């Protein structure tokens, strides 16, 4: 089953471009709010790194989500889109001074701090501005997620977070700093996680840490468990909205929250992944010795995930209903890795046919580059047509 697209309108647009189905986005946001709203103290932040298209950000902001940012640029993008500063959290292992100052000036909710040297700099910069910086400490729980090695973030070998053994000393250090206010703990174990057992393992680790801190009379008002919930890349039409009920229920059942504690989530891919498709045009059908190639005008510069992560995206010829043939779908970039898929079945494809690479709403447009001096792809939402 193919997706539904305004194909006639697409003929007028220069390819390649991203198309964002805002009906899917709004329905996804509705389900998120419904399911998270069933649990007291659950607060959801959108991970801006997944897709920072201004029109997309504005819709997400209007739905009431907060923003999870990993750079000064993302903080500014969130502010520009209307996200309240007191609902913005800022993470990242390498925060520059200007980015920290921006967060302080805007009055963001908190900095997710990843090391003592970073904490010292935040305190120093806050002191110069006579401000109090609210912080959560990102703890590396050494929990492995069943996902691609490049997108695991919670193992001891990863660069992210503070080791569990150092947690108490870091909190003690923060208590001595006059311009730091400790708010809680932050975790994030990875991305594109579909096994709820991974989130259960995180809950168990957090429960252990909370008991440990409680024994030392350390109060934790906020727990941020990051995001990581994946999407179904194989069946974008059958499963356009992830199982948010199971996701939020897992934390509600397995995590032992204290009275009055807030539980924060940072969801990106699960919010925007299925609403987006990369639309590209077929340039040539090339007969090789043992295969045929569908050469399209989009490349790894427009969607790098297949080359970077060997990621799968369902590919559809949305112009043709002819019987299927087998193709390698490749782009124009001067790299052998510029391949979207090998030996896939598409309806018989001709020059000029429009091809849709589905489930491209997350880590697509935002990761595009101008390698080979190519233009960046534009992003359009349903309302643009």
Where are these regions (language model features)?
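A charged N-terminal "starter" segment
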Residues: 1-133, 175-181, 211, 215-218, ...
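Charged (often Lys/Glu-rich) extended helix/loop segments that serve as interaction or gating elements
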Residues: 4, 259-385
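Short beta-strand segments
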Residues: 47, 134-140, 186-188, 224-226, ...
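Active-site-proximal loop/turn and secondary-structure-junction residues that shape catalytic pockets
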Residues: 48-52, 73-74, 94-95, 115-117, ...
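Flexible loop/turn segments at secondary-structure boundaries
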Residues: 52-55, 76-77, 144-145, 190-195, ...
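Short acidic, glycine/serine/threonine-rich loops at helix termini
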Residues: 57, 80, 100-105, 122-125, ...
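Hydrophobic residues within beta-strands of alpha/beta enzymes
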Residues: 67-68, 88, 111, 185, ...
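Active-site loop/helix belt of alpha/beta enzymes
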Residues: 142-284, 346, 372
């Amino acid at each position: 089953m193919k997706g539904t697209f305004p194909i006639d309108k697409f003929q007028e647009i220069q390819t390649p471009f991203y198309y964002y189905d805002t009906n899917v986005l709004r329905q996804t946001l509705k389900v998120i709010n419904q399911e998270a709203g069933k649990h007291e103290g659950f607060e959801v932040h959108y991970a801006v790194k997944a897709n920072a298209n201004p029109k997309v950000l504005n819709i997400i902001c209007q739905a009431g989500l907060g923003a999870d940012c990993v750079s000064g640029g993302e903080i500014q993008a969130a502010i520009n889109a209307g996200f309240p500063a007191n609902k913005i959290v800022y993470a990242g292992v390498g925060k520059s001074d200007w980015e920290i100052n921006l967060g302080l000036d805007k009055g963001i909710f908190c900095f997710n701090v990843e090391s003592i040297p970073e904490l010292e700099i935040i305190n120093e910069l806050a002191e110069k501005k006579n401000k109090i910086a609210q912080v959560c400490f990102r703890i590396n729980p050494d929990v492995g997620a069943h996902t691609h090695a490049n997108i695991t973030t919670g193992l001891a070998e990863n660069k992210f977070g503070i080791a569990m053994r150092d947690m108490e000393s870091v909190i003690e250090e923060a208590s001595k700093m006059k311009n730091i206010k400790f708010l809680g703990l932050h975790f994030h174990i990875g991305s594109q996680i579909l096994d709820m057992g991974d989130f259960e393992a995180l809950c168990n680790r957090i429960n252990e840490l909370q008991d440990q801190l409680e024994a030392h009379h350390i109060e934790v008002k906020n727990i941020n468990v990051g995001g990581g919930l994946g999407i179904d890349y194989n069946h974008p039409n059958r499963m356009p909205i992830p199982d948010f009920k199971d996701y939020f229920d897992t934390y509600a059942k397995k995590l032992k929250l204290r009275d009055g504690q807030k539980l924060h989530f940072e969801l990106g891919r699960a919010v925007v992944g299925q609403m987006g498709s990369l639309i590209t045009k077929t340039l040539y059908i090339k007969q090789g010795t043992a295969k045929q190639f569908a050469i399209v005008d989009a490349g790894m510069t427009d969607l790098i995930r297949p080359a970077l992560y060997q990621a799968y995206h369902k590919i559809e010829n949305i112009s043709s209903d002819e019987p299927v043939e087998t193709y390698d779908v490749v782009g124009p970039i001067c790299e052998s890795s510029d391949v979207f898929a090998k030996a896939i079945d598409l309806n018989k494809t001709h020059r000029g046919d429009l091809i849709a690479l589905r489930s491209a709403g997350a880590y697509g447009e935002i990761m595009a580059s101008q390698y080979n001096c190519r233009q960046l792809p534009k992003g359009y939402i349903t309302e643009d047509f």
